[in-house]
Amino acid sequence: MAVTRVNQGEIVEVPFELPDGSILPHPALVISNEYLQDYEDGLFYAVLISTKNHYLEFTIPIEDSWLNKPLSKSSFFVTHIIDQFNVDEVMKRSNTYLKARYFDYVVDEIIKNVIGGKEE
């Protein structure tokens, strides 16, 4: 069944373009709201989730307690790698969501790392 909608805070699998230019299926956290998705015919923004911690200053370890159900592997939000997708690019949904209080924390870290710079 084709995906017609995703929700803010949902973890989905999408074809993510990585910094080296390769495109690989990866889990990602939907960070944009539903209004954008409705207004732009299915467009949404998501932040990369990886099992590798290559960018220590930009990653957040994901704790099982932050989710409604745990991921299959130890993983990290890679807060500086964000991309746009369309709902028709979603490869898999697993009904996994980041709890609201942790969603706000992750978004704050994305803003700090991408827009506001790191505090010294």
Show which residues each predicted segment covers:
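Residues immediately flanking
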Residues: F16, N33, I81
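Short, charged beta-turn/beta-strand-edge "cap" motif at the junction between a beta-strand
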Residues: E17-G21
